[in-house]
Each structure stands twice: as C-alpha cells, then as structure tokens.
Amino acid sequence: VTTSAKDPYATFSPDELASRPTVFRDGLFRDQVIVVTGGAGVIGTALCVLFGRLGATVVACGRSRDRLEELSRHLARLAIPHSTDALTIRDPEQVSAFVDDVWERHGRLDVLINNAGGQFAAPATEITPKGWSAVVETILYGTWYASQAAARRWIAKNAPGSIINVSTVPGLVATGIPHTVAARAGQIQLTRALALEWAPHSIRVNAVGVGVVSGPSLHHYPPNAKPFFEANPMRRLGDVVDVAEACAYLAAPSGKFLTGVILPVDGGGSVWTEFWPLGKSDYFRVED
C-alpha cells in the first residue's frame, strides 16, 4: 500500500522502498551482515530493503514464519542477499542459538538492529498481566537478550560491533500505553548503560527515538487518537524510510563517533509532547 499524507494507515511496498532515492552511496554496507529483529514488520521491511540495496547481507528474524516467508520472496525478487529465521525474541535460548547460527553461516555480524516491538492502547486498569508481559518482554527483554548475545560473540572474537535500538521519543509519557512507556524507558536507559560498558570493546550502542510513522499498526489506536498522529512541529507523520535512513546513518562510518545517542526521528515530537493514544479526555482540555 502506498503511503500518503491522507492515509496514516498506509505504508510503502517493498518495490517502492527499493526505488526511492537515498542519500547513501551504493555498496556502503558491502560484505557486512546486518541482523534485523522484527524484520517482517513495516519498519523491519524498510530496514531490510535499505541495508540490502546498500550491499549488506540481511538476516531477518521474527515470530511469524508466514510473514518472514513473504518478506523473503520480496527480498529475493529485489536480489538482496538474505536469510530469515522464525523465533521468539522473548526466549533467551532461542536468541542465543540464533546469533550463534548467524556467525556459523556468515562468519561475521556487523550490525544488530533491535526492531522487535508491539503495543496496544488500553486504560491502565484494564491491561492484563499477560498483555503487560507481552509488551515489556518483547521490547525490553528482547533488546537485552539480543544485545547480550551479540556482544558476547563480538567480545570473544575481539571484533567491533554496532547495536541500534529502534525505540521511541525519549521521555514520552502518555495515557493508554503505560506498558510501552515503561518498556521504552528501560530500553533507552539500557542503550546508554551498554554504550558505556561496551565502549572498551569497540561496540557502539545507539537508539532511534521514533515518533508516529504511518502504517497499519496505527489501527491499534481508536479513531479519537487520530488527531494526535501529527502532534509535532512539522505537523505530519513520519514514514518508515525516515527510520531506516536514521539507522543507516548510525550504522555507517558517519556514526563512528556516536555511542549512547538517542537520535529523535519524530518531526520534533520530543519538544511537543502532546500525544493521546486513547484520545484526549475532557478532563485535560483547556478552554480558550
């Protein structure tokens, strides 16, 4: 589905992603291996296509085998070297085995992009323990498991590495998504802590603070949240290409002196923090 300013629920097709102009040179990531968790989602697909067209071998993982197979068909048609693996990012043993397999198959791992996530909007009193755990474990635990597994291999092999966490606007506080707010806050602080601890091993750890980007996932919010999708100084939604190119900037030599950075890709949303995932209740309205 083609994205447009009029349809916040649409996104780019893989073919459209592959044909869009980019500021990055061809072959920028040639001979590199890039792992993308949550690789079959809309942001994950954009990451796979961009890094692939810039020369990388892409390894995508995710929960849904069917969605990964669909992604694989698209990447094959675009002549992007790749492989896909179905796994549960919330299972540390599966994640560790997956990272081992990447090294065994490819002999290297250059960049890990922790993109797996997910959320739903609901009043805090109605979120079940299962719903809370699903979001927090996917975002925070999944980032930790994958980062630790990758770093262990890099350190053991005395190899440099780069970790990029696809996160959200730093300091975001919003009603209706307390599980996501908690998980993302932990993910951002984890980014900073690991950047400090792993710097002696030439492992850079950064994050992209993503604002509201167009795509089908916005259907998870009720209609009265729609007016707040563009609650940023640029008064528009971002798109998946904005996120993918920010990650490429951090992964490329352009980011070689960056670690512990949370790069906002949010249209200035971090300085205009009004976001109401369940819509704005009358209690918070200020009359003129």
What label would you give each PLM region?
Residues 32, 108-109, 154-168, 200-203, ...:
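Active-site loop of short-chain dehydrogenase/reductase
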Residues 33, 40-41:
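Conserved glycine-rich cofactor-binding loop
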Residues 56-70:
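Conserved glycine-rich Rossmann-like NAD(P)H-binding loop of the short-chain dehydrogenase/reductase
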Residues 3-20, 200, 207, 226-258, ...:
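C-terminal helical subdomain
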Residues 123-124, 128-136, 228:
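Substrate-binding pocket helix/loop in short-chain dehydrogenase/reductase
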Residues 51, 108-110, 188, 195-214, ...:
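Conserved Rossmann-fold SDR core element
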Residues 155, 164-186, 191-200, 212, ...:
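Catalytic loop of short-chain dehydrogenase/reductase
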